[in-house]
Amino acid sequence: QQIDDLIDLVVEVGHGSNFHILPCNGTEYIFYDDAGVRNEIVPDNMELNLGAEVFSELMAVLSNLQAEVAGDFWRQGLPLTGNFIQYRGSMINWCPIGRNAEGIQRTKFVEHDTETGFRKKHHKTLNEWVQWRKIPLTVALGGSTSFDIYPTGWDKTYCLTWFGDFTCWFVGDACHE
């Protein structure tokens, strides 16, 4: 699916036969040129960086938080769509309503978040846990519905480590922040 999406993007953007994209905070490199679509993984990996035990503990903390909020969301009529915690190699994305949520569902969550401060509260909770455990992680609000958790320094600009001499465009629904 990712390769098909890249081909569609190449056609839409109009860069012809030379297009490079760095999803996953720059730890994955997909490019399209005369030889076709190719994919390389940069040798950085969050699970290896943290260690299996700490990584598993983080996943357990997120799973417990998801279980807590799922009941509240269900009682309040908020959407739950599936694919709540996604490991992307360089980061974990936690989306309490689910990555599969579509427009109206996302809008409903954003309204709830604006009214209740849901993400601010859970951002604080996760940051307190990270500080208590003394783990070098950054917890950031990811777009309008999720949280991005990654090793400190591995934000979207991390790709500049590998491609600092190139023009890089950063995309996402909250890049203005």
Go through each PLM region and give its residues.
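Active-site phosphate-binding/coordination module
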Residues: 1-83
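Short, well-ordered alpha-helical microsegments
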Residues: 3-4, 156-157, 177
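Catalytic phosphate/metal-binding cores of nucleic-acid and nucleotide-processing enzymes, i.e., regions
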Residues: 11-15, 161, 168, 175-177
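Hydrophobic/aromatic beta-strand patches that form the interior of the parallel beta-sheet core
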Residues: 22, 169-171
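Short, glycine/serine-rich, charged loops/turns that create anion-binding
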Residues: 26, 98-101, 175
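Gly/Ser/Thr-rich beta-alpha loop segments that engage phosphate groups in nucleotides
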Residues: 28, 155, 174
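Conserved acidic, metal-coordinating active-site core of Asp-based
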Residues: 74-169
